[in-house]
C-alpha cells in the first residue's frame, strides 16, 4: 500500500533588519506575522527581526514602537532586540532591509551570491511608496512612529501578497 503520510514543508522565513532592532524592524516583524495570521497562514511563516548594530541587544522594543503597534491593534511586547548574524542568511528565505543603509551593510556581510540574492528593501514591494527608505523615528515624536508604522503596513501587505502563493500549501 502507498504511504499516505505527508512531508511537512518548512515555513517561509523572513528577517526584517533596521539599525538597533527596537523601532522599525520589530514593527515589520509583527505586522508581517499578523498578515500571515489573518489569512490562516501563521504556521507557514516565521517572521523575525534584527539590527545591524548591537546597542540594544536584549532590550524590549522602544516604548513608542510598542505604543504605535498597540494603537493599531498589534502586540509587540514579546520582542527582544538582537543583532543580525551571518547565520541569519542561512536561516532565512528573505532578508528585508528597512532602508538603503541597512541594505548596503547586509550586502557587505553577504558571504556569497546566495546570501546577497535574499536581500531586498521593504519599500520596494510597495508600488505606491514615495521612497525606498523607511525613516528612523528614534529621534522623533509619536506622530513619526505612527507614520512609519503606516508605511510598514502598506509595504508589508504588498510583500505578503507577492509571497502568499509561495507560502500557501498546495492542496
Where are these regions (language model features)?
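Phosphate-binding/catalytic loops
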Residues: 2-3, 94, 100-171
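Hydrophobic structural packing positions in well-ordered secondary structure
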Residues: 18, 69, 96-97, 152
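Conserved active-site segments centered on acidic
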Residues: 2-91, 161-171
Amino acid at each position: 500500500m502507498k504511504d499516505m503520510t505527508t512531508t511537512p514543508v518548512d515555513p517561509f522565513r523572513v528577517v526584517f533588519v533596521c539599525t538597533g532592532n527596537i523601532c522599525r524592524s520589530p514593527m515589520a516583524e509583527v505586522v508581517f506575522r499578523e498578515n500571515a495570521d489573518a489569512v490562516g497562514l501563521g504556521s507557514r511563516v516565521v517572521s523575525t527581526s534584527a539590527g545591524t548594530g548591537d546597542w540594544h541587544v536584549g532590550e524590549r522594543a522602544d516604548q513608542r514602537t510598542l505604543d504605535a503597534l498597540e494603537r493599531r491593534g498589534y502586540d509587540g511586547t514579546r520582542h527582544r532586540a538582537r543583532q543580525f548574524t551571518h547565520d541569519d542568511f542561512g536561516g532565512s528565505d528573505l532578508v528585508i532591509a528597512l532602508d538603503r543603509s541597512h541594505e548596503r551593510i547586509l550586502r557587505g556581510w553577504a558571504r556569497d551570491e546566495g546570501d546577497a540574492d535574499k536581500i531586498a528593501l521593504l519599500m520596494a514591494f510597495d508600488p505606491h511608496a514615495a521612497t525606498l527608505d523607511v525613516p528612523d523615528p528614534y529621534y522623533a515624536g509619536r506622530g513619526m512612529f505612527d507614520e512609519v508604522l503606516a508605511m510598514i503596513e502598506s509595504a508589508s501587505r504588498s510583500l505578503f501578497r507577492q509571497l502568499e502563493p509561495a507560502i500557501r500549501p498546495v492542496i
